[in-house]
Amino acid sequence: MGITLTEPELYLGEDVTGIATFHFAQGVACAWTGRAPDKESDNEDALGLIPCGSNAGVLVVADGLGGLPSGKQASSIAVRQVSRNIVASCNEHPVFREAILDGIEQANQRVMATGTGGGTTIAMVEIVNRTIRPYHVGDSEILVTGQRGRIKHQTISHSPVGYAIEAGRLEAGDAIHDEERHLVSNIIGATDMRVEIGPRITLAPLDTLVIGSDGLFDNLHAGEIKEI
């Protein structure tokens, strides 16, 4: 099932019909993006699968903010820019950290230079020989689960709700109903943008990696996501 990617596969503000499936970095990657069922405006999300040989690559999701066209433009800028940097850094022994961080910083400068007031979140995972490392800005999240559904890693959303959960002041199950769940504290497109880098994690054969925007994580509990 699926094809083997040899060059970047990018989805920039478009709705994907069905789930796109690819052989990617010694595993199988499934991609889908679409606007919310009750939303009349265009899809502001973007995603990319950027391979580097058969054993490595980077997965990225960006969620545009600020309303159309600026949100859609911002997420597309971010995914295109990091994709360019990753492709340029790809070699027999890839080291993605510098390319990812430089790509995010360059995307931040380019989004601010548009002058539209738009911004975007971003969540990225580098994969090299079944070892991953997460990077994120904003409230798009990264989740790693084990064979029996145990949560092995979950990023902290850069938002009032995310910080409240981490501090123990809000139960994760109550976050979906919190009135501040749509607020985000850190974005590409701001002078104070910062990138959070997670730990290196070696994936077991049946581990699952999920990268999604708040459209996923604001509507389903982590426990529900891992069941899917």
What are these regions (language model features)?
Residues 1-228:
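PP2C/PPM-type serine/threonine phosphatase catalytic domain
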